[in-house]
């Protein structure tokens, strides 16, 4: 029981980082004066997480599980320490990458404290795991260093990561730093496409030794579950990364209070995850819950696009509950569906692929949402408030607008800011809606006993 408890405590730390970053982002943009880097704060964390989900999944097969897990915790702790001490936005993004190797009393220290708090918790977990975590009946596969290196699919890594980085750079710079027709942006999109094609060719050639084995990903239940997970998670992360900004920039909430104001979303997610789990267990068929989840989530996200500067508590609480009920019901369904149809030997790989898709969808679509937000903010300010520099608004961050914008322009700036955030949420509505295609292709056939 103690070893199970220690593992769950550590999982709580990791989950905390997935959500606390979103709440701390407005404060981080103030500290580093880099509103344009919001997309990178989420995408860098999620991108490297999705990559190392698959790599660590393979490492567990070649080395003792306990020591691989402990090594990952130590790397995570180092990343948390350097994130808390990051002096610039660029350094923070780089250090976020380090902290993703594992699958506050005062508002002004929230951004650093969010990461430093991991250190004592991690130290306690390491001590407990050293004492009580015993993994029985695990025999690591013996392999030479050369064989191990090859099985990590290095060619897949060196084609996939640069491809996604090129794509994120194009989305980040397009329309703001450079025009969409600029040669740099076009070159980045072309290079991303070429590298992704190379990655797919490598996966096909390597088969079961690939990062994403074609034999498994092409199975109908896995393919459609992966599609659903990528779109559904992308929509969720798009909401959760920009909702705290809305509370802090539009409602003047502190970072701590904005976290509290997001509780309706989080609590409804928890409750309806149990509802979905119980429903699937009772009926033996996850497909109806896919449809219900997409309808609820799309409806909730759609209602959130009606947010205005003066939207009151009943609406932003109620809409979050509706959205959270759909997300909580749907976010775990792909894993349940895949585990119900895959042979036992393939379940770990299938689960790893879906976890990969979850964070991959977040990495890509948070960056897309940032491109939408930044472009709408810039064009909106130029059109509606010509006396205010878009560059100044982006440099000052999300919560210090009143320090550089005079009172006569503040109302108009908030309206433009609100419209830019809402525009990013339209992307979430579209993703939730299209995710229903995953349910259409889902197999309801359960694996034989």
Curated annotation (Swiss-Prot):
Q: What organism is recorded for this protein?
A: Aspergillus terreus (strain NIH 2624 / FGSC A1156)
The residues that carry sugar chains are 252
- One Gene Ontology cellular component annotation held by this UniProt entry: plasma membrane
Note the topology in the membrane: Multi-pass membrane protein
Q: What happens when the gene is disrupted?
A: Strongly reduces the production of acetylaranotin.
The record's keywords, sorted A to Z, are:
Cell membrane, Glycoprotein, Membrane, Transmembrane, Transmembrane helix
| Residues annotated as transmembrane | 6-26, 45-65, 67-87, 115-135, 155-175, 182-202, 227-247, 260-280, 287-307, 321-341, 349-369, 420-440
Q: What is this protein called?
A: MFS acetylaranotin efflux transporter ataA
The protein's role, per its UniProt record:
Efflux pump that may provide the dual role of acetylaranotin export and self-protection by allowing the fungus to evade the harmful effect of its own acetylaranotin production.
What subcellular locations does the record give?
A: Cell membrane
Any one GO molecular function term: transmembrane transporter activity
Q: Which family does it belong to?
A: Belongs to the major facilitator superfamily.
